[in-house]
Structures are given as structure tokens and as C-alpha cells.
């Protein structure tokens, strides 16, 4: 069996029958909720909109390196940009305002994260029935086992992207 890029696989001691599909779905759920892949470190090419401001926000919270930047189909010399670990680029030349104006090839992500354990916990719950609580005529509860618990949401919130311009 090939190890998936997120590095998580079922273990023999896992409670219940956790499958690779369960794990992959839990990881995909966390990534969708966060707005980016989170882990592991990987090179990726991303395309973003710009407001015309020289500061451009990339979809990451851990930028390790900027390999290339293209603005309006023109490569930007790397010495014409500054970047922060939180995913911001500052271009010396103001880009034009518009959709899909900036494409950057970046190295980003975390080597490890506590969210890997959250993904495994979510995968272990994948086949459990949804839990509901009813008081009178009102019923509340999680719609399915792949919904993070409140403690897991608090951890996930540390890795979620904010609103993008």
C-alpha cells in the first residue's frame, strides 16, 4: 500500500475498522474547513486575485519559500518581492487589480500538526451514528461523524485562513 501524501494510515490498534478512505475523508474535511492543505510541507502553485495593492495574500499560514511569482503573465524577479511566513507577499511594483492576476510557486505547510490526531479521531467516528439531543420539539446534534467536536474546532481554528481580499 502506498502511503498517502498526508502520511496517515490505519493502525492495527485503532478502535473499530478505520479504513484509508475514512482517514482520507477526515483529512479532506479538515483541509476544506481550513481553506488550505495544512500539512505536510509541499511545493504548490497557487493563483490568487489582487485588489491592486502591493500586498498579496497567499492561501497559507506557513510560507517557507517563494520559488517564483508571475503577475499578469510576467515573471517577477524574486529580489522584487518580500514575503512573510504568514503568507503575505509584498511586490515592489503594484499589480493590476483583478481576478487570477498573481500565480506563485511556493513551499508551504507544517511538517507535523495536532490536526493529524484530530483526523484519526474523526476517521474512527466515521461509522458511528449521528448523535442528537432532543428537548421538547427541538432536536440538535452533529449531522454526521465527520463533523469535528467542539474541542477539535478550537484546534482547527488555529489553522484556518481568514477572509481573503
Task: Give the residues covered by each predicted segment.
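Divalent metal-cofactor coordination and adjacent catalytic microenvironments
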Residues: 1-165
Amino acid at each position: 500500500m502506498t502511503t498517502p501524501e498526508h502520511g496517515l494510515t490505519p493502525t492495527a490498534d485503532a478502535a473499530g475498522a478505520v479504513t484509508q478512505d475514512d482517514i482520507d475523508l477526515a483529512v479532506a474535511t479538515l483541509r476544506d474547513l481550513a481553506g488550505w492543505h495544512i500539512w505536510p510541507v509541499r511545493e504548490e502553485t497557487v493563483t490568487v486575485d489582487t485588489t491592486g495593492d502591493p500586498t498579496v495574500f497567499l492561501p497559507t499560514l506557513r510560507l517557507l519559500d517563494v520559488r517564483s511569482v508571475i503577475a499578469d503573465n510576467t515573471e517577477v524577479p524574486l529580489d522584487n518581492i518580500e514575503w512573510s511566513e504568514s503568507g503575505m507577499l509584498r511586490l515592489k511594483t503594484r499589480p493590476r487589480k483583478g481576478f487570477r492576476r498573481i500565480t506563485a510557486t511556493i513551499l508551504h505547510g507544517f511538517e507535523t500538526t495536532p490536526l493529524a490526531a484530530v483526523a484519526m479521531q474523526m476517521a474512527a467516528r466515521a461509522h458511528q451514528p449521528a448523535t442528537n439531543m432532543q428537548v421538547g420539539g427541538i432536536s440538535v446534534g452533529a449531522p454526521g461523524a465527520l463533523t469535528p467536536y467542539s474541542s477539535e474546532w478550537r484546534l482547527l481554528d488555529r489553522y484556518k485562513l481568514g477572509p481573503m481580499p
